């Protein structure tokens, strides 16, 4: 923490511009990579018209959206309608100020860390900024004056509230083991072993929560095309729609960078590259960090291409009935092991690893259990009393048994 606060103004400005350029380039490449990967998985070429093999397609789409006519629907709250995309974008970019890209380097004779700033509670600050971004979504849905955007905004609010609880609990074990909430110090604490191995349940819970937090498939319920047209941004077009899309991909990059920081050693080189003496010095760590971020972005693309969208009740059941209870149990286990470590217990590392494997295996077994009971529902249909089944049938209200029989007979 003592290395921050001593940079000259031009160095801080240069780092801020570098982070902005990094995020913009990452978004452009991520959109193209996602479309190419989806095309490959669906046995089609993907974008291949603009530039060599479609390499400039994302840039062309951005220019197209910026130059399109801005259509404003009638009967809206104009101020909130126009401010909502800005509220979504600003927190997404701001959160990256606390992400460490690398160690101290020399820039024109000045020693400076590859990080804009840090705080004793930096991770909590990032968590708060991610929560602020949902205000732009819900305000955009409410200000549009239409039913589908409003439903999408309400869904997004419930989604973020539900999964931020599980995400915060996954952070708690990291804080316990590292003894700090500073991102740079958490990276320093993983110099030996990454927390993805020591705190496996926290990593799995965070991995699921970060997909739900960013409204991505299979948790893209706020913009479910088959139910809500386009969700909260149905009434947005031109540059305002592009800002919502930009915020989504920047948020994906932010949570991916946070996953690399908290669980994958941040900018530390992976094995066996860490055996090289210069792997964690100079500008090399920037390459390792970027590779880790892109690894998590690939998980996003892979999930979108392979998994169907969950129903809303299944999604909420996953968060409240599985992730949060398992997180609470795991926090207590990690706290006990941390207490034993403080009292001089020598075998705390193998004990923690064994506990991680046990809790993670239990969570996987619980994940294999269906979130709804299709067998019970099928037997209820055969008996003709589906309406009296205790299983919820969201979003369609259950029919009365008599009405079901009449419809079957008619």
UniProtKB/Swiss-Prot annotation:
Q: Which InterPro entries match?
A: NADH_UbQ_OxRdtase_su1/FPO, NADH_UbQ_OxRdtase_su1_CS
Catalytic activity entry: a quinone + NADH + 5 H(+)(in) = a quinol + NAD(+) + 4 H(+)(out)
- Please give, as recorded in its UniProt entry, the membrane topology of this protein: Multi-pass membrane protein
Top EC group: translocase
> What's the EC number here?
7.1.1.-
- Give a GO biological-process term: aerobic respiration
Q: Please verify whether the record's keywords include Transmembrane helix.
A: yes
Keywords attached to this entry: Cell membrane, Membrane, NAD, Quinone, Translocase, Transmembrane, Transmembrane helix
What stretches pass through the bilayer? 11-31, 79-99, 119-139, 160-180, 192-212, 257-277, 283-303, 317-337, 347-367
GO terms for cellular component: plasma membrane
Region listing for Disordered, in residue ranges = 376-410
Q: Name one GO molecular function term.
A: quinone binding
**Compartments, record wording:** Cell membrane
User: In which family does this protein belong, per the annotation?
Assistant: Belongs to the complex I subunit 1 family.
Subunit details: NDH-1 is composed of 14 different subunits. Subunits NuoA, H, J, K, L, M, N constitute the membrane sector of the complex.
What does the UniProt record say this protein does? NDH-1 shuttles electrons from NADH, via FMN and iron-sulfur (Fe-S) centers, to quinones in the respiratory chain. The immediate electron acceptor for the enzyme in this species is believed to be menaquinone. Couples the redox reaction to proton translocation (for every two electrons transferred, four hydrogen ions are translocated across the cytoplasmic membrane), and thus conserves the redox energy in a proton gradient. This subunit may bind ubiquinone.
UniProt-listed NCBIfam families:
PRK06076.1-2 (NF004741), PRK06076.1-4 (NF004743)
* Protein name (Swiss-Prot/TrEMBL): NADH-quinone oxidoreductase subunit H
From which lineage does this chain's organism come? Answer: Bacteria, Bacillati, Actinomycetota, Actinomycetes, Mycobacteriales
Gene that codes for this?
nuoH
């Amino acid at each position: 923490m003592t290395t921050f606060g001593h940079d000259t103004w031009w160095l801080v400005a240069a780092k801020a511009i570098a982070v902005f350029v990094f995020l913009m380039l990452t978004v452009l490449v991520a959109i193209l990579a996602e479309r190419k990967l989806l095309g490959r998985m669906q046995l089609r070429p993907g974008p291949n018209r603009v530039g060599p093999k479609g390499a400039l397609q994302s840039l062309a789409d951005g220019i197209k959206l910026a130059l399109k006519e801005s259509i404003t629907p009638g009967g809206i709250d104009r101020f909130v309608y126009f401010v909502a995309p800005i509220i979504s974008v600003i927190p997404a970019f701001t959160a990256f100020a606390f992400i460490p890209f690398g160690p101290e380097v020399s820039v024109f004779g000045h020693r400076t860390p590859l990080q804009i700033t840090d705080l004793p509670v930096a991770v909590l600050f990032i968590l708060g900024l991610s929560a602020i971004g949902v205000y732009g979504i819900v305000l955009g849905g409410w200000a549009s004056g239409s039913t589908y955007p409003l439903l999408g905004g309400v869904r997004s609010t419930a989604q973020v509230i539900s999964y931020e609880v599980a995400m915060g609990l996954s952070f708690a074990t990291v804080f316990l083991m590292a003894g700090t909430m500073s991102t740079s110090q958490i990276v320093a604490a993983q110099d030996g072993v990454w927390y993805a191995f020591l705190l496996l349940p926290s990593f799995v819970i965070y991995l699921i929560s970060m997909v739900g937090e960013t409204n991505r498939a299979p948790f893209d319920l706020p913009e479910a095309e088959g139910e809500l047209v386009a969700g909260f941004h149905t009434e947005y077009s031109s540059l305002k729609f592009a800002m919502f899309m930009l915020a989504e991909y920047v948020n994906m990059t932010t949570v991916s960078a946070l996953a690399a920081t908290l669980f994958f050693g941040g900018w530390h080189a992976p094995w066996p590259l860490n055996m090289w003496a210069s792997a964690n010095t100079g500008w090399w760590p920037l390459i390792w960090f970027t590779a880790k971020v892109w690894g998590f972005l690939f998980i996003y693309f892979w999930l979108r291409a392979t998994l169907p969208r969950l129903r809303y009740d299944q999604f909420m059941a996953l968060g409240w009935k599985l992730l949060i209870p398992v997180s609470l149990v795991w926090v207590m286990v990690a706290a006990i092991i941390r207490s034993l470590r403080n009292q001089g217990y020598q075998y705390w590392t193998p004990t923690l690893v064994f506990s991680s494997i046990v809790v993670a295996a239990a969570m996987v077994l619980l994940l294999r259990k269906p979130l709804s009971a299709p067998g019970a529902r099928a037997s209820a249909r055969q008996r003709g009393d589906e309406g009296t089944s205790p299983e919820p049938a969201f979003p369609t209200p259950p029919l009365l048994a008599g009405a079901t029989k009449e419809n079957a007979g008619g």
